[in-house]
């Protein structure tokens, strides 16, 4: 993996670490304020930070919380100041939750802005 691809992958990992820590700011540091998202548990396209925050607020405290997120099998292509990331996310829950592990197929688009890679679009689908 080249240096630029590694930087993008580190930003992807930082988002997942922020999620597990319950740290929105850590996540948001790696998202463009105008990012769009296809979330696996929310059908409409999320457009921008305000819609993302509204979705997060509606979801807060509902359902089991993941205990581990492992992003695997990354495929990253960098085209100048744009990067395309594909990977599978393994989501694990506490055994007592009764929730099975989830496999989520993820594709994201990143843009280099002021020396930092920011996610401008994310698309995830739960694999059954």
Regions found by a protein language model. Give the residues of each.
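Short, cysteine-centered beta-strand-loop-beta hairpins and adjacent loop/turn segments enriched
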Residues: 92-100
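A short hydrophobic beta-strand element
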Residues: 78-91
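Short beta-strand edge/turn micro-motifs at domain boundaries
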Residues: 103-128
């Amino acid at each position: 993996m080249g240096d630029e691809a590694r930087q993008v992958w580190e930003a992807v990992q930082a988002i997942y670490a922020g999620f597990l820590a319950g740290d929105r700011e850590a996540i948001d540091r790696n998202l463009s304020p105008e990012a769009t998202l296809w979330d696996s548990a929310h059908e409409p396209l999320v457009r921008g930070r305000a819609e993302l925050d509204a979705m997060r607020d509606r979801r807060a405290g509902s359902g089991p919380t993941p205990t581990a997120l492992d992003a695997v099998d990354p495929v990253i292509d960098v085209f100048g100041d744009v990067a395309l990331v594909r990977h599978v996310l393994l989501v694990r829950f506490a055994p007592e939750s009764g929730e099975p592990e989830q496999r989520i197929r993820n594709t994201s688009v990143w843009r280099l802005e002021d020396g930092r890679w920011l996610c401008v679009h994310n698309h995830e689908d739960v694999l059954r």
